[in-house]
Structure formats: C-alpha cells, structure tokens
Amino acid sequence: MNFKYIVAVSFLIASAYARSVQNDEQSLSQRDVLEEESLREIRGIGGKILSGLKTALKGAAKELASTYLHRKRTAEEHEVMKRLEAVMRDLDSLDYPEEASERETRGFNQDEIANLFTKKEKRILGPVLGLVGSALGGLIKKIG
C-alpha cells in the first residue's frame, strides 16, 4: 500500500510540474506576442510621424523653391536653391530607400554604410532646418 501511495503522489507531483511548465511556456509566448504587437504599434506610430514630417519638409522645400523661382536670384539665393534641390533629392531617396542604398553603398563595408547614412541624415536635416529658419526669419522681417 505504501508503494501505491508513493507512486500516486509522484504521479500527481509530476503532472502538476508538467502543467506549471506548460503554463509558463504559454505565458511567455503570450508575453512575446504582446511585446511584438506593441513594438509593431510603436514602429507604426513612428513611421507615421516620420512620414508626416517628411511630407511637411517636402512641402516647405517646394514652397521655398517656388518663392525663389519666379524672381531674379542673387548668388547666395542660387546657392540656397542648389542646396534645396539636393535636399529634395535626398528626401525623394527616402521614399525609395532600397534603390538609394543600392546606388550609394556598393563596395562599402557595414561601418562605412552606417557612417554614410548618419552623414546623410545630418546632410538632410542641417540644410532643411537652416532653410526653414531663414525662411521664417525672412517672413517675420517682411511682416514686421
């Protein structure tokens, strides 16, 4: 009788342990799924924000280009237009990153590629922020 009791208790302990392991695995997989879903949502929100920002920058750049287009330009304004055109090309290349990265990164190693994209981001944001700042400054001077 003791032997049957020991076997029964051992069986109950083993089945309880197996159920707890199975529950742990299910809860971990559910947590992984929830974390993955939340990361997707965050990426989606970030993508929408970047898309909106990119659209706004493109609109501002086009507006500045049309402002400078219909009048006689000085050498400084001509340089601003050249930088603005470069920014527009860079913004357009952001729409098709695969094609742009294929053209720009042939023959580079991974570190050089990372440095290239960091430099490209600085090259895009620097002139855009400068142009937007100077345009707003010019508008404020005209209004005031």
Curated annotation (Swiss-Prot):
Keyword NAD among record annotations: no
InterPro entries listed in its UniProt record: Bombinin
Propeptide: 19-43, 73-122
An example Gene Ontology biological process: defense response to bacterium
Record key words, sorted: Amidation, Amphibian defense peptide, Antibiotic, Antimicrobial, Cleavage on pair of basic residues, Cytolysis, Fungicide, Hemolysis, Secreted, Signal
Keyword Secreted found: yes
GO cellular component, one term: extracellular region
Cellular location(s): Secreted
Signal peptide from the UniProt entry: 1-18
Principal location: secreted
Annotated tissue distribution: Expressed by the skin glands.
Isoleucine amide PTM sites in chain numbering: I143
Domain of life (superkingdom): Eukaryota
Described function: Maximin-3 shows antibacterial activity against both Gram-positive and Gram-negative bacteria. It also shows antimicrobial activity against the fungus C.albicans, but not against A.flavus nor P.uticale. It has little hemolytic activity. It possess a significant cytotoxicity against tumor cell lines. It possess a significant anti-HIV activity. It shows high spermicidal activity. Maximin-H11 shows antimicrobial activity against bacteria and against the fungus C.albicans. Shows strong hemolytic activity.
Family statement drawn from the similarity comment of this UniProt entry: Belongs to the bombinin family.
Protein name from the UniProt record: Maximins 3/H11 type 1
Organism of provenance: Bombina maxima
Taxonomic lineage of the native organism: Eukaryota, Metazoa, Chordata, Craniata, Vertebrata
